[in-house]
Amino acid sequence: MELNQSEKMLFALLRSALNTIPVNSALFADVSLLSWQNCYKLAVEQGVMALAWDGIQTLPTCLQPPKALKLNWAMAVENYEKRYRRYCHTIAELSAFYKTHGITTVQLKGVGLSTYYPIPSHREGGDIDIFTYSADHSRKSDAEANRLADQIGRASCRERV
């Protein structure tokens, strides 16, 4: 299967971002607005929009997307970064909360894996996955953690009303 222009562009941007190397500039000479828009759309659909942005930053300015698209892309990346900080804050709070109840948490996937990326806040995550356990094997830490999470959820809902 032959990749189209936008797909080739996206893979080149991702390769650059993940390997911290410059993008092959030749691929970006004379790129149409439509190709840039399709590249952006594909990056969003695949959850790699911020990583693609990192690749764009290695291109000479004259080969980067048109200004309007570039501004939208930059604002979307900023939103990724804000969400990432919110996730990190929530994970820290949740881990501290469970610790006060004798439950240890281990973060799985998502934000936890982001530390392996050149810019951790540019790895998209949709939720927070944790594994819970207790040093006291007589306790059912998963059931206790679920009960506590339900309690937090109900309290949070009451605060919003």
Please annotate each region the language model reported.
Residues 2-8, 19-109:
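Helical scaffold of the NTase/Pol beta-like nucleotidyltransferase catalytic core
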Residues 2-3, 82, 142-146, 156-158:
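Non-catalytic regulatory/linker segments of enzymes
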Residues 13-14, 158:
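Conserved short internal alpha-helix adjacent to the catalytic or cofactor-binding core
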Residues 34, 112-114, 153:
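Short amphipathic alpha-helical surface micro-motifs
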Residues 83, 91-93, 149-160:
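Conserved catalytic core of two-metal-ion nucleotidyltransferases
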Residues 90-149:
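Active-site nucleotide-donor binding segment shared across nucleotidyl transfer reactions
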